[in-house]
Amino acid sequence: MFLGTYTPKLDDKGRLTLPAKFRDELTGGLVVTKGQDHSLAVYPKEEFAARARKAAAVSRTSPEARAFIRNLAASADEQRPDAQGRITLSVGHRSYAGLTRECVVIGSVDFLEIWDAQAWATYQEETEAAFAAAEDDVLDGFL
């Protein structure tokens, strides 16, 4: 399970060190793809494969479904962390997420998200008020 917030730095070669506590779950490989809200999503390879099979089963008669599947698959980059736990983020991924040197990696239960640190701070400020309201609507009394 992926939980918590971490602040690794992106190096000049586009490499990002993943939090040590998650490396065991990612030794079988991982997939980096575009995420929501201009973040990057990092899935264990098996989790991404399961989600891809689910997406492939959706009818492609809908333009929205076709666009989603195309964007998801076209932006997917399969990787294995190196011995230091680093992954290399493509120029396209770094550009999409607006990544600078300062990054934030957050656990999203079954996958990770990579954010530019300033973008994450802004997102948190903008969504903080909705957090309490969302509990009842989205999670039915989780907290």
UniProtKB/Swiss-Prot annotation:
It comes from the Bacteria. It is found in: Cytoplasm, Nucleoid. Keywords: Cytoplasm, DNA-binding, Repeat, Transcription, Transcription regulation. Residues 5-47, 76-119 form the SpoVT-AbrB domain. The keyword Kinase does not apply. GO terms for cellular component: cytoplasm; nucleoid. GO terms for molecular function: DNA-binding transcription factor activity; transcription cis-regulatory region binding. GO terms for biological process: negative regulation of DNA-templated transcription initiation. Its main location: cytoplasm. Forms oligomers. Belongs to the MraZ family. This is Transcriptional regulator MraZ. It comes from Corynebacterium efficiens (strain DSM 44549 / YS-314 / AJ 12310 / JCM 11189 / NBRC 100395).
